[in-house]
């Protein structure tokens, strides 16, 4: 079935991205594979979308290894740190038998609750709350120490490892932090929680994206209980993890994102790329607990959907910008690629913009107007 969506107010100026919120019917993963071939060049483009169901009731809960990393620097002192500690305390209530957890604090250095993740027993949770109560904000922000402490210890492969950073993100070495996440992420997922009224969104969003996670914000008036309940509801019942795509005979290239994220309730997975020589159905597989599930995504030829190529271009630009964040760009090669892609596909970017040119003619006469 199809639906047509348009702006209700015809006079609305479309000067920003259009966002459509919708719910997926049913309790199974839905999929769509749009393809388009440029009639001049023959270059093919595709966009594949995987939609999880609205609720997580049909997915079994997975054992988790939760690592809470708290920024205890001076900029977090007061209400932000209190909110972060309360959010972690609420999160501890959502742990179940079979889960493990760790708490790491950092400022100018890092310390942690235990030498290794602890089983989520009542006694260990009581000890964790006493540890939280003693934390206070002071000193500088050496987030790199928190990154190393959270990602360097061995991973228990029987559990999904989620690393939750609670921070305002105010540091001076953003590129080093993002590079460290890229180099050390392994099988972990990073979820960034921006705490306070003014946070470093650039850093938090880049960390979450590089860590195949997501970002959330905990403002002064927000409820840590609601945010953590929503967070645990999603991550403890993943629709599919460790996704892999079998392209069959489809000759694909330049596929984005380079790291395919897990599929959680409330977050679709979008993969786009180029192809040559025709499109075909593809197979997507991933883990749901210990079991591997596979599904077929049918290709649909949308010959009148030239915007599929622009979706590819937008995700390519986003990928190049992410690489700039951790790889840096001393010779400007990534910048040039972003600019060239944006110009070819007529898109806004950090290096291109739209310019309105008035083509109207001035009338004759001394008092002519345009």
Locate predicted features:
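An acidic, Ser/Thr-enriched
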Residues: 1-69, 192, 221-222, 241-370
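Generic structural signal for secondary-structure transition and capping sites
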Residues: 100, 137, 237-240, 347
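Flexible loop/turn segments at secondary-structure boundaries
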Residues: 55-57, 75-77, 110-113, 171-173, ...
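Short secondary-structure transition/capping segments
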Residues: 116, 228-231, 362-366
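Von Willebrand factor A/integrin I-like adhesion domains
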Residues: 165, 198-238, 242, 345, ...
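Short, charged loop segments at secondary-structure junctions
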Residues: 61-79, 86-89, 93-99, 104-170, ...
């Amino acid at each position: 079935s199809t639906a047509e969506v348009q702006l209700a107010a015809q006079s609305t100026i479309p000067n920003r991205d259009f966002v459509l919120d919708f719910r997926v019917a049913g309790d199974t993963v839905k999929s769509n594979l749009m393809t388009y071939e440029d009639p001049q060049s023959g270059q093919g483009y595709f966009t594949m979308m995987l939609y999880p169901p609205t609720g997580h009731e049909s997915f079994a809960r997975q054992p988790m290894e939760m690592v809470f990393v708290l920024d205890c620097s001076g900029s977090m002192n007061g209400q932000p740190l209190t909110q972060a500690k309360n959010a972690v305390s609420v999160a501890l209530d959502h742990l179940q038998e079979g889960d493990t957890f760790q708490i790491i604090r950092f400022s100018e250095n890092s310390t942690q609750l235990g030498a290794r993740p602890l089983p989520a027993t009542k006694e260990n949770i009581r000890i964790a709350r006493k540890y939280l109560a003693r934390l206070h904000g002071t000193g500088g922000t050496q987030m790199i120490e928190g990154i190393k402490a959270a990602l360097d210890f061995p991973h228990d492969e029987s559990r999904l490892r989620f690393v939750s950073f609670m921070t305002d993100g105010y540091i001076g070495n953003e590129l080093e932090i993002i590079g460290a996440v890229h180099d050390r992420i392994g099988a972990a997922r990073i979820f960034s929680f921006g705490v306070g009224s003014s946070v470093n969104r650039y850093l938090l969003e880049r960390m979450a994206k590089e860590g195949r996670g997501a970002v959330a914000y905990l403002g002064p008036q927000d409820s840590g209980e609601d945010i953590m309940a929503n967070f645990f509801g999603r991550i403890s019942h993943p629709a599919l993890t460790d996704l892999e795509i079998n392209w069959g005979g489809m000759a694909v290239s330049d596929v984005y994102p380079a790291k395919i994220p897990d599929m959680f309730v409330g977050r679709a997975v979008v993969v786009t790329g180029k192809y040559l020589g025709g499109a075909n159905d593809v197979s997507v597989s991933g883990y749901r607990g210990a079991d591997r599930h596979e599904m077929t995504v049918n290709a649909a030829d949308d010959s009148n959907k030239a915007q599929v190529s622009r979706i590819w271009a937008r995700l390519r630009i986003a990928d190049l910008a992410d690489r700039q964040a951790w790889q840096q760009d001393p010779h400007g090669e990534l910048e040039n690629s972003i600019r060239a892609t944006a110009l070819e596909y007529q898109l806004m970017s950090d290096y291109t913009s739209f310019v309105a040119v008035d083509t109207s003619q001035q009338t004759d006469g001394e008092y002519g107007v345009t």
